[in-house]
């Protein structure tokens, strides 16, 4: 399994997915985590799993459809380029199944690690 991680360590509001990545990797050595730039092309697996900052949520949450981010959303992907690229891949038919593990920008580090870990492998 591969999980893509989006984020920008230079922007505080978008840095948490990158900051927690070493701990998540330690918890799940059998999973391949890859930091990706939303503006680059990526191989799209049958099920694309992404960890990214999501504005407008108070807790770590899983999204299984891009419809939650379209129009005038109640929540929005922090990085518009990620959303635009994902919609493009969906339109091309290359995006079959998606899971976005949304991380609020201001959640506590340890809480984020715990919540994401529980979503990756629920107990």
What annotation goes with each model-predicted range?
Residues 1-123:
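N-terminal catalytic or cofactor-binding beta/alpha core of small enzyme domains
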């Amino acid at each position: 399994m591969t999980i893509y991680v989006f984020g920008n360590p230079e922007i505080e509001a978008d840095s948490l997915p990158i900051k927690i990545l070493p701990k998540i990797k330690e918890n799940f050595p059998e999973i391949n985590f890859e930091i990706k730039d939303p503006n680059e092309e990526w191989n799209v697996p049958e099920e694309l799993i992404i960890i990214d900052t999501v504005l407008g949520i108070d807790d770590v949450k899983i999204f299984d459809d891009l419809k939650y981010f379209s129009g005038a959303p109640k929540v929005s992907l922090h990085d518009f380029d990620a959303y635009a690229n994902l919609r493009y891949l969906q339109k091309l038919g290359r995006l079959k199944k998606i899971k976005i593990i949304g991380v609020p920008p201001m959640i506590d580090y340890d809480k984020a690690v715990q919540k994401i870990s529980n979503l990756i492998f629920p107990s």
